[in-house]
Amino acid sequence: MGKDVIIACDFSSAEQTFAFLDKFTGRKPFVKIGMELYYAEGPSIVREIKKRGHKIFLDLKLHDIPNTVKKSMAVLSRLDVDMTNLHASGTCRMMEAAIEGLTRPDGTRPILIAVTQLTSTDQESMENDLLIKEPIDQVVMHYAANAKKAGLDGVVCSPLEAGKVHGICGNDFVTVTPGVRFADGDIGDQKRVMTPADRKSVV
């Protein structure tokens, strides 16, 4: 993947999405389709954006019992997305089942990455709401190591943790870092963020 920039299509309709993508004259950015757009438009939005020549990260964060995730991943694999994800907290067994479901009969599959801790989560909320007392970066590293052990290609993590993840899992292990914001920009409900310039310097 290198250091691809993934553009979020955080819209509630196909019309808004295509109007946005039409602004990229002559370019076909790697795009993220999240829950809002996918639940509004269904698989057809994936097929149409793919038909337009874009690479797609389908960001649905699956988290369920292993067999349900396995069957769901088999469906997503047929959509020919380039990358999709799940929650690492679903256990190694769930992640292994996801790989099985995602792998096509010819042995190919989309890139599969695991969400470690959402960038809206901080130490306080992790301890009080999730009853996880370990330091957040330690939890992220543990989840990343589990994802690698289960055969996944990478993780979603804060840009603050990407360098440490590569130190543990190797430089080829994919890190997708959603918490990248301009210094004077609105960070919304994100807690663990970094500026684009700082993120660029992370290995």
What is each of the regions a protein language model found here?
Residues 2, 68-153, 161, 168-172, ...:
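Conserved anion-binding
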Residues 6, 32, 57, 82-85, ...:
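Conserved beta-strand positions in the central sheet of alpha/beta enzyme cores
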Residues 8-12, 34-38, 63-65, 89, ...:
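Active-site beta-loop-alpha junctions enriched in small/polar residues
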Residues 12-23, 67-75, 136-146, 191-198:
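Short, acidic/polar
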Residues 21-26, 44-53, 74-78, 100-106, ...:
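Acidic (Asp/Glu)-rich catalytic clusters
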Residues 30-83:
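Metabolite-binding pocket within alpha/beta catalytic cores that recognizes anionic/polar moieties
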Residues 43, 157-198:
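A C-terminal functional module that forms or caps the active site or interfaces directly
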Residues 200-203:
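Conserved small/polar residues in nucleotide/adenosyl-binding loops
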